[in-house]
Amino acid sequence: MRVSVPGPAAAAAPAAGREPSTPGGGSGGGGAVAAASGAAVPGSVQLALSVLHALLYAALFAFAYLQLWRLLLYRERRLSYQSLCLFLCLLWAALRTTLFSAAFSLSGSLPLLRPPAHLHFFPHWLLYCFPSCLQFSTLCLLNLYLAEVICKVRCATELDRHKILLHLGFIMASLLFLVVNLTCAMLVHGDVPENQLKWTVFVRALINDSLFILCAISLVCYICKITKMSSANVYLESKGMSLCQTVVVGSVVILLYSSRACYNLVVVTISQDTLESPFNYGWDNLSDKAHVEDISGEEYIVFGMVLFLWEHVPAWSVVLFFRAQRLNQNLAPAGMINSHSYSSRAYFFDNPRRYDSDDDLPRLGSSREGSLPNSQSLGWYGTMTGCGSSSYTVTPHLNGPMTDTAPLLFTCSNLDLNNHHSLYVTPQN
């Protein structure tokens, strides 16, 4: 089993024997081998699998595009972790959809296994290599978002001071991943010896997959810290999320990305001498020769399963986690507003509760729950409460008879508005 060793950034594709052919991919030894092999997958099966994955990527593109429009509709912040992650997933799904749609122009062959020989460097890198950079950037944004949640919950100034360093660290990691990916792709696309090709692939996999593993470890640390905070769930619910969703999505992303990175490192390390591996472990074929794949039916099914796990599941998890939601403005049930808070109505001069003290708050809370009927007197000093629609009772002074100098303030809400002069009772001679 002889396969070429490609880049570090993608899912596994099984292969069972390669034969070099002419750059045009026409008649040659490879075509004869493919025709002679009875175990090869028919072109219709390859086309069906390509169409299936293209539809899945197109559905992800449409869903992410819809979420971005919903963010604008709900008047959310245009530049946030949520919008950036959705945009990166949108761009990633667009590139993957374009790649799998090329199967129609390649007579049903899977473009991942049989890239066109005449494809120039930049389109080749953009379709085959750049999506891995987008996935790594999405993982970095997920780390930054959870770090932001920890800072918001703890409200610690020392964490805010390190926020800039944290942002710079993940930005530098993303740039390093991009530079290594682009540089190695440029070296491999040229005419390089076989030994240099092996070491280029090894260095690329070692750096990029190590960055994936380090980001996964940091994501584990952030999730562990969030689960230990009792108030983290309240903050996440105010953003339309929950602690359970955060743990599940983070665990799925960590498990899949770290397992793929470890697999890539193992395959590159083992195949340094023989270039043999049970799977074609990357998206792009870094050899400058065109190849024809002779793939059995079982290996092709395994390829589809691995592609679904390492590509679709983490991408859909991130998009569903950062989907746009209409936030509930009433945060009292979630505990964001305590019982001493007032209504959201804005008062300028006539706030009816501007003189309330702390002793009045339990009485106000019980009155909101309906514990006091309209006919019951509150017993405040100098107040008159209504026992019906037209009768009022004056509450006597607590320390004796009412003096002539203390006016009585009516607080009953069902007074006739035409009797303005009856609001204050003055001594009558």
Swiss-Prot record:
Its main location: membrane. Residues 1-29 are annotated as: Disordered. One of its GO terms (biological process) is positive regulation of TORC1 signaling. It is found in: Lysosome membrane. Residues 1-48, 105-120, 189-205, 268-300 are lumenal. Glycans are attached at N285. It is a multi-pass membrane protein. The chain crosses the membrane at residues 49-69, 84-104, 121-141, 168-188, 206-226, 247-267, 301-321. It comes from the Eukaryota. Residues 1-17 have a biased composition (Low complexity). InterPro entries: GPR137. Residues 70-83, 142-167, 227-246, 322-429 are cytoplasmic. Keywords: Glycoprotein, Lysosome, Membrane, Transmembrane, Transmembrane helix. GO terms for cellular component: lysosomal membrane. PANTHER family: INTEGRAL MEMBRANE PROTEIN GPR137 (PTHR15146), INTEGRAL MEMBRANE PROTEIN GPR137C (PTHR15146:SF1). Lysosomal integral membrane protein that may regulate MTORC1 complex translocation to lysosomes. Belongs to the GPR137 family. This is Integral membrane protein GPR137C. It comes from Homo sapiens. The lineage of its organism: Eukaryota, Metazoa, Chordata, Craniata, Vertebrata. The gene is GPR137C.
